[in-house]
Curated annotation (Swiss-Prot):
Record-annotated membrane-spanning stretches: none
One function term, GO molecular function aspect: structural molecule activity
Recorded superkingdom: Viruses
Misc note: This protein is translated as a fusion protein by episodic readthrough of the termination codon at the end of the capsid protein. Readthrough of the terminator codon occurs between the codons for Tyr-132 and Trp-133, thereby producing the readthrough extension.
Record's keyword terms, sorted: Capsid protein, RNA suppression of termination, Virion
Protein name per its UniProtKB record: Minor capsid protein A1
Amino acid sequence: MAKLNQVTLSKIGKNGDQTLTLTPRGVNPTNGVASLSEAGAVPALEKRVTVSVAQPSRNRKNFKVQIKLQNPTACTRDACDPSVTRSAFADVTLSFTSYSTDEERALIRTELAALLADPLIVDAIDNLNPAYWAALLVASSGGGDNPSDPDVPVVPDVKPPDGTGRYKCPFACYRLGSIYEVGKEGSPDIYERGDEVSVTFDYALEDFLGNTNWRNWDQRLSDYDIANRRRCRGNGYIDLDATAMQSDDFVLSGRYGVRKVKFPGAFGSIKYLLNIQGDAWLDLSEVTAYRSYGMVIGFWTDSKSPQLPTDFTQFNSANCPVQTVIIIPSL
């Protein structure tokens, strides 16, 4: 890390036609972070893209690779307002058992390439503010009138990647019956439980293994071969909190389709069911009974706030819809 070289990132973006040139900015002696940022002709824009590689431990076992893109939203010919930005951010942390080798450093470069393929990063690259492109083009051409703004969507549509197979829901799902008891103030309606139904998702279990960017992701997955199981690296998937969903307050919040349901029998229990597909409702108590082996998986789609929230209350069925439900296999 003592020597940093200029790096050109080419063939990036949706169409593979974007190129960014990053210039070394030095190593921070306090935290060991080495930074490269885009060298643009407009000084106020130089920090739009930053790639950092950190080695915080003295024995160099831990590496953290980060990419941050900042897109100024208010530009003139010579400057931009740095206080107004849209950002996309992705990172990955790698731990090694010894001093870094050429192979391990090659793995970091591979991870960097994987991060650049992150849909949120791709979106930020392809959908930069039109005024930003105008400022860059004017600066690179030596003056003149600003070119017309590119056709950039106001709210890019971020969608989850397609699955590679089929996966049957490993937990019981049911239809909803009629209302068993009308809710009173501060409590939701209670429904009767309907017939059991089978649910199959258009994903294979392998589509989700190897992802290190989950909230409370099971650490046993680190034993998987990340070189071959990286298709979910940093792609916006997240482990939704099935425990927090099981409350009257959550049902009343309407953030996800959760209903309070009375199971059959004179002594039938009251449970919380989550709508996961059509008229199929998942028994959340079965998911949490597995104590982190079961997971309800959502996908973050809000391109206006690309960085995944750490607060579960910020998630809802619009910005992070449910994609599938899995059981993590024993290793």
